[in-house]
Amino acid sequence: MPGDKQEAKNATQKTEEGVHITEALITKRNLTFPEDEDLSEKMFHTLDDLETVRLDGEGITCIGNLERLRNIHSLYLQSNKIQRIENLACITSLRFLSLAGNQIRHVENLLDLQYLQFLDLSENLIETLKLDELPQSLLILNLCGNPCTNQDGYRKMVIGALPLLLDLDKQPILERWTSDEEDKSSDEEEEFPELNGPFCAERGFFKDLEQELHQHQERRQQAALTEHLSRMETQPVLTDLPLLPAVPMAGDCSPAVTEEPGKEAAPKATSSTQMASSSKKQVPRNQKGSVQARKGALAATASKTSLAAAPSMTKSTNKRGTK
């Protein structure tokens, strides 16, 4: 269909010169919204609102078609096949530009970017560096991996040409790191978070982070040791618990005896063997009653017979006494 062909043409506009930046490509990488019929008008207003555009790793060979990106402050074009720096004058608000890993041979067409603070041109093919082509507003510049960095006096010349530069090729310019500069840089980084990228972070960030983590670990170890020592010094507290009431053993019919407060408890058996022997010697109460009844009956009978046979009993008694 004609519409599909046109869309494919806009998405990957390939000519003999290479791959160009298109609005369709920008939309594909940086915008997401539902499909509808009136897409062109919506795209127009949305592109105007973009502040960060990522087009890295798309095989782009030429920079162009950025006129609608009026408000962007960060542009990522690394890992492409770009050979020239061009067509950037239309985005004067740009603060962050990454062109690392391309095929650029010359630094040019950057003077219109008066607010540019971060420029990454590492891993390109720049042999001769034209310092007058670099914006004076630069704070961070990375040219690592270019032949021009091997030139005698290269670092001194770049620092002298850029009075605001604070970091060159991942190395801070120590003589320019004053408190005023740090306060100014922190304010700008809060406004533009892209300035907190890997090259900014290497200005002592990881060293400070490692030191802070080490101090935190030492504090935790000290706290654990203090807690351990305090626990070792603490003596256990013994409390007097009330005695539980005695539980009768199996086969014992005697009621449980509760001790009155203030009286000492009677000594108890110290072994199960003694308890067993004592239980065997005890006579039930009902058996004692029957024995006493029989003794009473015998006593009554004896009294009656004694009246009838008194002489004989006396005689027998005398005989026992003589014996």
From Swiss-Prot:
Domain LRRCT: 146-188
GO terms for cellular component: motile cilium
Phosphothreonine modification, residue list: 178
Gene3D superfamilies hit by this protein: Ribonuclease Inhibitor
Coiled-coil regions listed: 203-228
Region (Disordered): 252-323
Localization, UniProt: Cell projection, Cilium, Flagellum
Top-level taxon of origin: Eukaryota
GO biological-process terms attached to the record: sperm flagellum assembly; spermatogenesis
Biased composition (Polar residues): 269-290
SUPFAM superfamilies: L domain-like (SSF52058)
Function of the molecule: Required for normal spermatogenesis and male fertility. Plays an important role in sperm flagellum biogenesis.
Protein's UniProt name: Leucine-rich repeat-containing protein 46
Gene from which this protein is expressed: Lrrc46
